[in-house]
């Protein structure tokens, strides 16, 4: 298990746990006074998904998103400078616009990996007039779903606690769950 203490900041927690639902939950607990948290990251069997991309603007460029998202994100890519590859400027947000990245230049390859998210953006520019591919104010938006644990994933993590020698107060399972999972957890503890 990874140990997170109450004196760790957001940056240190994210270094340990990444941009994950577990990190989000741990930060909430630390913010509310938890002094020590033992974390058992679980590789979810069901991978995260990416929604359809919606475009705002009338330029000729396009964007797709690929990868295995590691959390639920509300992504907004907004163009702040006109052009094509290696000239257009953009910002991105992974929290629905609450915060934005610094402005960056659209890479020469047309591909940009959003750091720490597991998502890669692939842009296509207009072949005949690349300088008209993206206009100021163009935006591409989409959401992702976090990876999902199966009942077996949760039960395997709980099984590891039986060999854990530290004293702890409770178990917090992070992520979506179903009544069937809780029935399986209850049965495993009997």
Q: Which residues does each predicted region cover?
A:
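Surface-exposed assembly/interface segments
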Residues: 1-190
């Amino acid at each position: 298990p990874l140990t997170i203490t109450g004196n760790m900041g957001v940056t240190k927690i994210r270094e340990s746990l990444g941009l994950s639902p577990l990190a989000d939950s741990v930060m909430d607990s630390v913010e509310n006074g938890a002094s020590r948290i033992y974390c058992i990251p679980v590789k979810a069997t069901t991978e995260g998904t990416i929604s359809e991309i919606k475009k705002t603007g009338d330029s000729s460029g396009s964007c797709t998103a690929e990868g295995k998202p590691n959390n639920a994100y509300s992504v907004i890519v907004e163009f702040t400078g006109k052009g094509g590859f290696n000239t257009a400027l953009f910002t991105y947000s992974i929290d629905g616009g609450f915060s934005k990245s610094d402005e960056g230049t659209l890479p020469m390859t047309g591909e940009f990996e959003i750091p720490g998210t597991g998502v890669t953006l692939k842009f296509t520019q207009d072949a005949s007039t690349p300088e008209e591919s993206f206009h100021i104010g163009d935006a591409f938006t989409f959401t992702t779903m976090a990876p999902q644990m199966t009942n077996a994933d949760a039960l395997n993590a709980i099984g590891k606690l039986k060999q854990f020698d530290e004293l702890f107060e409770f178990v917090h399972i992070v992520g979506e769950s179903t009544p069937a999972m809780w029935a399986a957890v209850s049965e495993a503890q009997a």
